[in-house]
Every structure is written in structure tokens, then in C-alpha cells.
Amino acid sequence: MSDQLFERTMAFAGILQAVAQVQYIARHGDSDKEALAASLQSVLVTNPESTSDVYADKFALRKGYELIVSQLGDAKQKDVEVTRYLVGILALERKLTRSSNAMGMLSERINQIHRQLSHFEITDEQVIANFAGIYSDIISELGPKLQISGNPEFLKRTQTQQKIRALLLSAMRSAVLWRQLGGKRRHLVFSRKTIVDTAMKSLTL
């Protein structure tokens, strides 16, 4: 397995890991704090020496790798909701990377969160609110808004909305990295077996 394929699959798992948390929070109103922290941390690693630097908590990526296997593998039952979120994220990523203005604002806002972390934990409500604000102010303005399905009782809560937006920002960060590593949408059609095999090997490491 080539290093680039391994790293590209890792970044793709990062997208799906964040998407899985969005789905869970929308349905259940809560999240795994460690998984949430791992996804948010990936947003802050903007100049990594390797993809592994972005995803320091390898265990947190397990759900992402498992989703690669189930969504791109031979399983008959695909999660259409996960697919819809993924397609939306990849479409927004293209708009983001084509806008130097948006990328500049994104970098500036991420630096503000770095400074905030000298006073708060990454899963503190104020920090999550800032991650969510970045998504609302910059990413949401780029194109059609993602329609999140779930329990209306949870979705109307401000904290739930902020966690979802913060995680969508994390998914965007992984999508940008996936593209930088050579990821293309056609790979998800024509190279599915290779991606699935790589994900399965990654699950055993």
C-alpha cells in the first residue's frame, strides 16, 4: 500500500468520521467527547508534516474506516444519508478551495481559536461556538446549505446546532486534505476496491 494511498484514505476516513458524528448528534442530541475533540483538533493542524499529524488519535478514525468499508464495499445496505452529506461536503470543498478570499478568512479565524485554547478546552461550549461560527460565516455562504436530518427536538437546540456546524467544518478540513493528497470523486467509483482494501488494512494497524 503506497504512503499516498494510505494518507489519502486516512483523510477520507476523517471526512466520514465527522459525518458519522453529525448524524449521531442530530438523532440523539449528544456526542462522544473524545471523538468530538479528535475531529475538532484536525481543523487546527494546518501545516502538518504528514497526514498522521492531523489525526493524532488514530482510534477515533475507526468509525471513518468502517464507513468506508460499508459505503464503498460490497454491502447491499448503504447509508444514503451519509452519502448525501458526503456529496454536499465535497461540493462545498471545491467552492472553498477556489476562493482565495474564503481560504484567507478561514485561516485567520482558525488562528483566533488557537489563541482561545490557551484559556479553554477544545470541547468547551465557547470554543465549539467559534468553530460553528466559522462554518456559518464562511462555508455556508459558499453554496447550498446542507440539510441535516434528525430528531427535531434535538435539532432546535443551539448546542446541537453548534456541534453539528463545528463537525461539518472538521469534515471540510478533511475534504480539503483529501483533495490535496490527490483525492478525486472518480476514485470513489473506479477505485473503490483499492480504497476499501486500504481502509481494512488501516483498521488492523
Curated annotation (Swiss-Prot):
Cited SUPFAM superfamilies: YcfC-like
Main location group: cytoplasm
InterPro entries in the record: HflD, HflD-like_sf
Cellular component terms (Gene Ontology): cytoplasm; plasma membrane
Signal sequence, renumbered to the chain: none
HAMAP family in the record: HflD_protein (MF_00695)
Family to which this protein belongs: Belongs to the HflD family.
Protein name: High frequency lysogenization protein HflD homolog
Species for this entry: Shewanella pealeana (strain ATCC 700345 / ANG-SQ1)
Gene that this polypeptide is encoded by: hflD
